[in-house]
C-alpha cells in the first residue's frame, strides 16, 4: 500500500468515530432530559403550610369522594389543607356538632380530660381500598362471631354479644328493631363494653363512594340513641358538598 493510502486510512477512522459519537451523545442528552422530567413529576413534594383553624371549610377528596371539612375540626394540623387526602381525623362537640374552639387554651383542669373526651364525637374518613364495605361486614363477618340470640335493652335496642375467643370478644352489636342487614336501613353500631374507668365506645360505619366514615362516641350516649342517630346523619350531611 502506498504511503498516501495509509495517510487517508488513518485520517478516515477518527471521522467515522466522531460521526458515531454525535448520535450517542444526543441520545444520552435526551435520556437525561426524560429522566429529569419523570423525577420532577414523581418526586414527592412536601405539602404547603396548613391553613388556620378558623379558615372556612376546606374542599377535600378522599378516594375521589368530595367533602367540605372545617379546619378547626381537623385533629392533625398537617391535614389542614385542601385537595386529596388518604385520611382525615376529625372531632366535633356534642350535641352542637360544632368544631372544637380553636382559640381555647390547651391547659386543662384536673379531671377535665375524661369530660372533654365524652363531650366530643370523633370522625375518621379513610380511603376504603380493598376493605370490605360495612354493610358486607355486617352480613358476612359479624354473624360468624356473634351469639345467635339477641337481648333487648331498656332503650329499645337489640344487643348481640360477640362470643369469647373471637376477634370481637368483649364487644356487642346493637341495633334498632327496623334494622335490615340486606338494605342497611336502620341504626346499627358495634360497641365495646365498659371496663372499670374506661368507658365503652361505639363505632358507627358508613361507606360513601370509595371512602369509609367511622364515627366514635361513648356507649353511654345510647340511652338516647335516636338523637345520636339523627346527629350522625346531620353531621355526615354537613360534611358533604351541597349539590
Task: Enumerate the language-model features and the residues they cover.
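N-terminal Lys/Arg-rich, disordered targeting/topogenic segments
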Residues: 1-20
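Ser/Thr/Pro/Gly-rich low-complexity linker/stalk segments immediately outside membranes or between
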Residues: 41-59
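Extended hydrophobic
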Residues: 195-214
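Hydrophobic membrane-insertion alpha-helices, especially the h-region
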Residues: 21-41
Amino acid at each position: 500500500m502506498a504511503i498516501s493510502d495509509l495517510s487517508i486510512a488513518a485520517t478516515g477512522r477518527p471521522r467515522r468515530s466522531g460521526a458515531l459519537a454525535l448520535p450517542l451523545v444526543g441520545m444520552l442528552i435526551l435520556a437525561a432530559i426524560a429522566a429529569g422530567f419523570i423525577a420532577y413529576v414523581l418526586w414527592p413534594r412536601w405539602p404547603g403550610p396548613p391553613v388556620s383553624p378558623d379558615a372556612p371549610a376546606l374542599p377535600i377528596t378522599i378516594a375521589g369522594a368530595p367533602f367540605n371539612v372545617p379546619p378547626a375540626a381537623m385533629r392533625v394540623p398537617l391535614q389542614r389543607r385542601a385537595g386529596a387526602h388518604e385520611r382525615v381525623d376529625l372531632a366535633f362537640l356534642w350535641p352542637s356538632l360544632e368544631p372544637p374552639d380553636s382559640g381555647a387554651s390547651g391547659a386543662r383542669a384536673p379531671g377535665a380530660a375524661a369530660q372533654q373526651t365524652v363531650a366530643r364525637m370523633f370522625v375518621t374518613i379513610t380511603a376504603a381500598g380493598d376493605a370490605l364495605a360495612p354493610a358486607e361486614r355486617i352480613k358476612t363477618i359479624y354473624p360468624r362471631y356473634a351469639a345467635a340470640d339477641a337481648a333487648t335493652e331498656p332503650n329499645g335496642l337489640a344487643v348481640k354479644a360477640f362470643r369469647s375467643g373471637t376477634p370481637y370478644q368483649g364487644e356487642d352489636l346493637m341495633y334498632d328493631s327496623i334494622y335490615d342487614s340486606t338494605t342497611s336501613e336502620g341504626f346499627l353500631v358495634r360497641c365495646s363494653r365498659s371496663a372499670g374507668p374506661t368507658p365503652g365506645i361505639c363505632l358507627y360505619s358508613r361507606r360513601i363512594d370509595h371512602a369509609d366514615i367511622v364515627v366514635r362516641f361513648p356507649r353511654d350516649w345510647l340511652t338516647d340513641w335516636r338523637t345520636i342517630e339523627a346527629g350522625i346523619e346531620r353531621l355526615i350531611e354537613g360534611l358533604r358538598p351541597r349539590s
